[in-house]
């Protein structure tokens, strides 16, 4: 039920953010992320009823923590070196985890952070990618009955908060220096990993 409430909100937030970051994305990266993510969504659609969501939370959370630690301890580690193959792999995982547990952001970060983009291109690319991912998810979510009218009413009630969040993030990004911005992204990724493990265990 929570997933059905979140998805319409995320889409509205994505449309709001894409207006603010219009044409700030990098097409060569988007062309890798979107097709692979759609494959992951399709795989999730047909396997979700056989999947243990808590196990996925624990695995994604653990990888998130390891990724952040390795990134800070060994920045030149070959495991972090970005390649197109890693892009397709992590993007497909992102589509899968986004469909199942609304946690597509960590796997996308495993690919995008090592690319060392500037913060505007990073946000613009991420925004367009997740706009498409979330819109595509509408079809399978409707198919499995997660887009119930009662869920949509709750989503509408939370709309003002969604708009405020997007605007706050936009203006905050403009004030934060590049290095600090990405340090915050790494910290949030680490905390997200801890939260996923906690949710998976509890």
Stretches found by the model and what they are:
Residues 43-49, 57, 97-103, 137-138, ...:
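Hydrophobic alpha-helical transmembrane segments in multi-pass integral membrane proteins
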Residues 45-55, 79-80, 141-153, 199-202:
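Membrane-interface helix termini and inter-helical loops of multi-pass transporters
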Residues 4-73:
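Membrane helix-loop-helix hairpins that form the core translocation module of multi-pass transporters
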Residues 168-190:
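Interfacial loop-to-transmembrane junctions
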Residues 1-31, 90-95, 105-159, 163-166:
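Small-residue-rich hydrophobic segments that form or flank transmembrane alpha-helices
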Residues 7, 61-64, 68, 127, ...:
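Residues within membrane-spanning alpha-helices of integral membrane proteins
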